[in-house]
């Protein structure tokens, strides 16, 4: 490798590392008269700083246009792939949004309860079947199915859902897990979603643990100093 190529390679590595470090740092968003601190879980980085049309399109596909996207995070490995122009794995990712119609108003506990009821209506009850693959195989392809209620407090509700993709001729069905958390934070209603491909029970444990830890971390980040 020539000296010039070594310098270019070194600079590229430093740039990638700097970008990932910056994206992984906590940041604040202004919602009406409140500043909300946000941060992605460990091992993930926000991508909104990239202003990438490709990533913006991907994030917008996850939520209705009536929501404002505050954070869209990829794994650190995927962010490095994106920086290098390589294909993304997209095995795990997450998003935080807030309803545009509520972002400037202070949300009371009553209004937040109504927001929960409207957002989670029709989910049904969690199944008795604990085998995720067995249960999803019995459900319609592509439908989101409630798997469990993870948390239910006055200021935070979390649910776990799963879906199955249709198998192709040469491939078996794929399974996807997602958690949705509705969180009242500093008088603002936030919706947090985490997505992971399901290959084995460790993915189920990962999304449960990450959902709980992320909510607790955000509440701690926004607690009065």
Descriptions of predicted regions:
Residues 54-175:
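Conserved polar/disulfide-associated segments of primarily extracytoplasmic proteins
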Residues 1-6:
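N-terminal secretory signal peptides that target proteins for export/translocation
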Residues 27-31, 160-163:
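Short acidic-hydrophobic surface loop/beta-edge motif
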Residues 148-222:
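Short, well-structured beta-strand
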Residues 22-26:
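Boundary at the C-terminal end of the N-terminal hydrophobic targeting segment
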